[in-house]
Amino acid sequence: MRYITAGESHGPQLTVILEGVPAGLTLAAEHINKELLRRQKGHGRGRRMQIETDTVEIVSGVRHGMTLGSPITLIVKNDDFKHWTKVMGADPISEKESKEMKRTITKPRPGHADLNGAIKYGHRDIRNVLERSSARETTVRVAAGAVAKQILKELGVEIAGHVLEIGGVKAKHILNLSIEEIQIITENSPVRCLDKTVEQEMMDAIDNAKNSGDSIGGIVEVIAEGMPIGVGSYVHYDRKLDAKLAGAIMSINAFKGAEIGVGFEAARQPGSKVHDEILWDEEQGYTRKTNNAGGLEGGMTTGMPIVVRGVMKPIPTLYKPLASVDIDTKEAFQASIERSDSCAVPAAGVVAESVVAWELAHALVEQFGKDRMELIQQNITQHNKYAKEF
């Protein structure tokens, strides 16, 4: 499976085309809209989320609530486009109109794609860069992730995400929660945090950053349960599932690090405390005493829960802008200000769920049969029986 997205932040719409989704998957707009709404929530979101009412339109690949096996096209309209029709229109405009309407940006913002992208593509107007590099694009990545979650659900895999840290405020590690319990708690938390004792402190940190014109980042964690043993591969570097998951996390806007299992903590512990001892019994088959590997060894699943974390840097669009240089005059200026969030960590956690879900669904479809859901389900059942008796 693969997908490609298109669209600008203030353009008419965002589009994603999904290829390789098996036939026979139950899919309706409500499944996707539920995830889009989750992305819009979270303490610290900016005014843009008050403007947009993200809903999906399925325009191909689905008939009467069932996928056909052909490419699926999803679109999400940008409600704010009505205020940008001249600025972001596709048709040529006159030189006079250009000066009046283009809202040309020549001051790159530190921490963004602005300067590097302008140099790479030769854009003298940085708006041509920021419109596409904006995190608004993650709207349709969440839509793609919603489809992946439907695949996982029908294949017996559950997934959930939560916030571990915001602006230096850390949540306690809460053990032995089911995926359903994680989902219920986070959906009722403004910061998607499991630890209610630090929830208000996280919100205060976000408010303090906003009031001072600053921004803060944090850490999110995604957990998936129900993956069969042996999904992925050790044979080639580009087929290792942990590599794909880390790459997916790092592809999210403003994410600067990824961990699987205990992650970097493994560097501080001896091997005897890091590696997960193997157990077997007639009822469960092969299991592990611990899950420090985060459900992945040698590029393959171990059958234990997948645990992936990502670190998001503070959003670089600040209301007290940092120093920059005008690319036309080369004079020092304060960077341009675009409407933005003070903290998007809770929403980014939803995006992280989506990209992890896509990689897991892709791995299952690739390994157990690509054409139709019924065949994939049968193959997984047979594989699980084989693995248990191995």
Curated annotation (Swiss-Prot):
Pathway(s) the chain acts in: Metabolic intermediate biosynthesis; chorismate biosynthesis; chorismate from D-erythrose 4-phosphate and phosphoenolpyruvate: step 7/7
Residues that hold NADP(+) according to the record: 39, 45
Enzyme class (EC, first level): lyase
Keyword Cell division: no
Cofactor(s) needed: FMNH2
Binding site for FMN: 132-134, 253-254, 298, 313-317, 339
GO cellular component: cytosol
Keyword set, alphabetical order: Amino-acid biosynthesis, Aromatic amino acid biosynthesis, FAD, Flavoprotein, FMN, Lyase, NADP
GO biological process: amino acid biosynthetic process; aromatic amino acid family biosynthetic process; chorismate biosynthetic process
Function description: This reaction introduces a second double bond into the aromatic ring system.
Designated name of the protein: Chorismate synthase 2
Pfam family, one: Chorismate_synt
Catalytic activity line of the entry: 5-O-(1-carboxyvinyl)-3-phosphoshikimate = chorismate + phosphate
Stored SUPFAM superfamilies: Chorismate synthase, AroC
InterPro entries reported in the protein's UniProt record: Chorismate_synth, Chorismate_synth_AroC_sf, Chorismate_synthase_CS
Family: Belongs to the chorismate synthase family.
Signal peptide limits: none
Cofactor note: Reduced FMN (FMNH(2)).
Keyword match Repeat: no
